[in-house]
Amino acid sequence: MKRIGVLTSGGDSPGMNAAIRAVVRKAIYHGVEVFGIYYGYAGLIAGKIKKLEVGDVGDIIHRGGTILYTARCPEFKTEEGQLKGIEQLKKHGIEGLVVIGGDGSYQGAKKLTEHGFPCVGVPGTIDNDIPGTDFTIGFDTALNTVIDAIDKIRDTATSHERTYVIEVMGRHAGDIALWSGLAGGAETILIPEADYDMNDVIARLKRGHERGKKHSIIIVAEGVGSGVEFGKKIQEATGFETRVTVLGHVQRGGSPTAFDRVLASRLGARAVELLLEGKGGRCVGIQNNQLVDHDIVEALANKHTVDQKMYLLSKELSI
């Protein structure tokens, strides 16, 4: 294999640039040309493809976002769109593709694989919801962003003796809510993977108040429901002064943590190795701090599950 491509797709995550850097430098080290595909699958279809040199990925390891940009692309879900993409890859002499992104990006890589084009998926999403890996690129950075917000909000919650509801990202996965809530000492954590009883939430808040607790922090994953509506219900049911903070897209930005930079470097380099070994149709990950790879079709057939023991621990510690 003499020429490979790399793209980022779907929602951006801190550390994507570190992964791009690793792909480019690893490939060039082995004498392979690398082409950056801009704006994800939409850019692939449109032929927004440019050769990348070592200098193009200098001074980016610490930067959030993605220098290749990203975009949603409904057209690539169609066979016609997929064939247009393959036509562009062949036009540029690209023989293998590294796809950095989340579940939707993996679905695109799977389709290319089914058309006979070698692809390797690299997990890049703050949601940490990709099967076959303990951690995804960007999760640790987003987690630290949320924890920083929790710590600051707790300061003002204490000063004003208020209850605060903090809504975090996670439409289908509760990892950000669970991990940040546990690390931030939240009194209640609500995630999409677990049912909750509003009466129980209110009863817990009242018990804490009776014990002399002057403030509370509640973490709500967006997939559970609106943090604003949740806050209204709590104030109406308890009479406690309640405020709501929706963290939103701040969770996707920022300079990646050391963990995410190292993770991205390891996974990006391993993706190139797999292509050079002739192993397309794979996705890379890290499990028990060891690099692993899986068949991308089999990986997508599985479902990411939240750590139930950690969830139970969070409930035990928030009495």
Curated annotation (Swiss-Prot):
Mg(2+) binds at D103. It catalyses: beta-D-fructose 6-phosphate + ATP = beta-D-fructose 1,6-bisphosphate + ADP + H(+). Pfam families: PFK (PF00365). Its EC number is 2.7.1.11. SUPFAM superfamilies: Phosphofructokinase. GO terms for cellular component: 6-phosphofructokinase complex. It is an enzyme of class 2 (transferase). Allosterically activated by ADP and other diphosphonucleosides, and allosterically inhibited by phosphoenolpyruvate. It is found in: Cytoplasm. Belongs to the phosphofructokinase type A (PFKA) family. ATP-dependent PFK group I subfamily. Prokaryotic clade 'B1' sub-subfamily. This is ATP-dependent 6-phosphofructokinase.
